[in-house]
Amino acid sequence: MASAADWGKPLGANHDGPEGRPRSVTPASPELGADERTTITVFERATKSVVFIANTAIQQDIWSLNVMEVPQGSGSGFIWSKQGHIVTNFHVIYGADAIKVTLADRSEHQAKLVGADPDHDLAVLQIQVSDGQLDPMAIGSSHDLRVGQKVLAIGNPFGLDHTLTTGVVSALGRTIKSMSNRTIEGVVQTDAAINPGNSGGPLLDSAGRLIGVNTQIVSPSGAYAGIGFAVPVDTVNRIVPELIKHGKLIRPGLGVSLVPDAMAKRWGIKGVIIGKVTRGGPADRAGLKGARETMLGQIQLGDVLVSVAGKAVTTIDDLMDAMEEHKIGDHVTVEILRGNRREKVPVTLQAVN
C-alpha cells in the first residue's frame, strides 16, 4: 500500500533512484574548434561597433491636436568614426522625424541625419558621445571577395539586438534596385540569414572586416529564404566620406537633362537622348545639343549618347553607372548619334546634382 508521502507521485516514479537526479555533464573536448574560436572572436570584437536604430514620425491628432511620436520602424547600423558617424540604409530612416541610436552598452542617443544617398540606399547619422566611447568598424574590401568565403552578419532582426548569423558569399556582381529605382551594381549575395531589422547592419569577412551593408532579401514571405544582398564596401567607402562632407553624393556629369528611357524605346532609339543642355556646362562647352524647335514649329531630337569612355550606354542607368567610374575633372570621350552621323566629342566632367 502507498504511503501518504507517495501520494501524488506518478505511477512508477522513483525520486530516490538515479533517474530522479540531474544527469552528470558529459566532459567537452579541451578546446573549441578553430573555426568556432574565430567566429566568437570576430563577433565579440565587431558587435561593439553595431547599433540599433529606431525612428519615429511626429503626428498630430486631428481631434485633440496633441502631438504624438509614432514608431516608424527599426533597423541596424554600425559605427563609422570616433566622431559619432553611424552608417545605415537610407530606407531604415526614410520618413523619420526623430532617430534614436542604441549602442552596444545600451546607452541611447538622439541622432541627426548628416547625409543620404537614396540611389545606393545609404545614409549617415551622427550622435554626440564622449571621447573613447565608440569603436569604429574595421573596413575591408569587396573587389577581391571570392564565392565560398565565410561571412558573418550582425544586426537586430525583429528587434533582437546583436544577433549573429553566418554563411558564405553565394555570388558576386549582383544588381538590385534601390528605393529611387536606380540600379546598385556589384552587390554581394549571401546565404547568411538576413531578416527585417538586419537592414543597415554589417556583413563581415572572417577577419571581422566590413565587406558590405546588408540591404535586401529575396523572399516570397518577407522573411529569410537564403538569399540576401549587401551593398559592397568599396561602394560604401567611396560614398560615405562624400555624405559626411557634402550631405549628398556629388557626381561628375555632363550637365544635361535626359529624355526618359521609355520614350527612347518607343521611338526605337538605342541610346540616351539629351533633352536639354545646361548653359555653360560641360556638354554645352563641348557642343552637344538638346532637343530644339525648328523654324517650322517641329521638335528636333537632341543628340543621342551611345557611349562614354568606350562604355556603351543604352539607358539612363547605364549613363549614370558610366559616370560613377570617373571623377570630377576627368576628360572623357563621349560618342553621340546626331541625325544619321556618329561623332566622338571630348568632354571635361564637372560636379552636378
At which residue positions do the language-model features occur?
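Short, solvent-exposed beta-edge and connector elements
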Residues: L65-V67, I273, A286-R292
